[in-house]
Design a protein with these regions (language model features):
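Beta/alpha (TIM)-barrel catalytic core signal, keyed to glycine-rich beta->alpha loops juxtaposed to Asp/Glu
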Residues: 127, 133-336
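Structural motif
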Residues: 41, 45, 113-114, 147, ...
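Alpha-helix-loop-beta-strand connector modules within alpha/beta enzyme cores
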Residues: 66-80, 138, 142, 146
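Active-site mouth loops of central-metabolism enzymes
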Residues: 20-32, 89-102
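Short, acidic/polar
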Residues: 29-42, 98-114, 158-164
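N-terminal binding-site loop/beta-alpha segment at the start of enzyme catalytic domains
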Residues: 1-76
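Conserved beta-strand positions
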Residues: 16-18, 52, 121-124, 154, ...
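Active-site groove signature of glycoside hydrolases
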Residues: 111-129
């Protein structure tokens, strides 16, 4: 696989988001043994940039990755997160906690579950509006000084927040949702208003061009959900999801919104047909085309999709392709 640079370390141009192996998507398809095998196969393919977080199965996902990396830890760049916790009612509404005490305690818990002595990339999952960013980020910087974390990142932040943190300790990565139906992080309008999990906690303000900020400041940008939570693959045509699948309560997957958003998929399919590729590969390749500093992390639990997603690294979109894709209409419905 082609590689991209993360803080001086080459990683596969396409990473692997591991959340769905433990949380949020189709619980009936979860299989820990199969997921362990898939993670190891990902490493064989050159997919070496792995992403997890404590809330993904309330620690289950981190433990799963720790199991998969036994004997192969040095082959992966491992990212996890702090700052969000699963509430007592185990609902989708994760609770923010950016206190220095929580930041440090959760790092120790993550190290234990992951079975490692150092975290390669430690994100602040969401900024806590009740805790100064400088306090959360300062505690994370102390973990770097202690040798427990190598690099720091932010998730779902604005340009102003990224700059504030960067002035205290270098920001190595910013992770935000970016796909053909969510382009806020690239400075496009829409999609953030009223969300509870966005960069500002639902103020309705846009984040600014975070992708460009990363390029200008030596950070990588990590798009999560580059496949639009599966929608951009062209395989989702109805809003019939399991109770354990959060897409069942996601505004963009309501029947009316879903049908309207199929206009986006039609363009993706047309580009894919020209290249003999799949819609998923085109959607991922579009994120890769946003800059050499961009490393998308599509998630999957299935081998065939792992191989399909990895193949996107070899798909070179033309200027005509990109113009058509950039011209798709904004998605109908809020992100959350």
């Amino acid at each position: 696989m082609r590689t991209r640079d993360f803080a001086g370390t080459p990683v596969g141009a396409v990473g692997l988001g591991c959340m769905g192996m433990s949380w949020a998507y189709t619980a009936s398809e979860r299989d820990d043994d199969a997921s362990v095998a898939l993670i190891r196969e990902a490493l064989d393919l050159g997919v070496t940039f792995l992403d997890t977080a404590q809330p993904y199965g309330d620690g289950h996902n981190e433990a799963l990755i720790g199991r998969a990396l036994k004997g192969r830890r040095d082959e992966a760049v491992l990212a996890t997160k702090t700052g969000l916790v699963v509430p007592e009612d185990a609902s989708w509404n994760l609770v923010r906690n950016g206190t220095p005490e929580h930041v440090k305690a959760s790092a120790e818990d993550s190290l234990r579950r992951l079975g490692t002595d150092v975290i390669d990339l430690y994100y602040l999952h969401r900024v806590d509006p009740d805790v100064p960013l400088a306090d959360s980020w300062g505690a994370m910087a102390e973990l770097v000084a202690e040798g427990k974390v190598r690099r720091l990142g932010l998730s779902e932040v604005s340009v102003a927040q990224a700059a504030e943190a960067h002035a205290i300790h270098p920001v190595a990565a910013v992770q935000s949702e970016l796909s053909l139906w969510t382009r806020d992080a690239a400075g496009a309008p829409g999609g953030m208003a009223g969300v509870s999990m966005g960069h500002t906690g639902g103020t309705g303000e846009g984040p600014g061009d975070v992708v460009a900020w990363c390029a200008e400041n030596g950070a990588v940008f990590v798009p999560y959900a580059p496949l639009g939570r599966g929608f951009l693959t062209g395989t989702i045509t109805s809003a019939d999801f399991e109770d354990t699948d959060f897409r069942g309560v996601n505004p963009r997957f309501r029947e009316d919104a879903l049908k309207a958003n199929l206009r986006i998929v039609d363009v993706v399919k047309a580009v894919a047909e020209r290249h003999g590729a799949t819609p998923a590969q085109v959607a991922i390749a579009w994120t890769l085309a946003q800059g050499e500093h961009v490393i998308p992390i599509p998630g999957t639990k299935k081998r065939r999709y792992l191989h399909e997603n990895a193949g996107a690294a070899d798909l070179d979109l033309t200027g005509t392709d990109l113009a058509e894709l950039d011209g798709v209409p904004a998605a109908v419905g809020d992100r959350y």
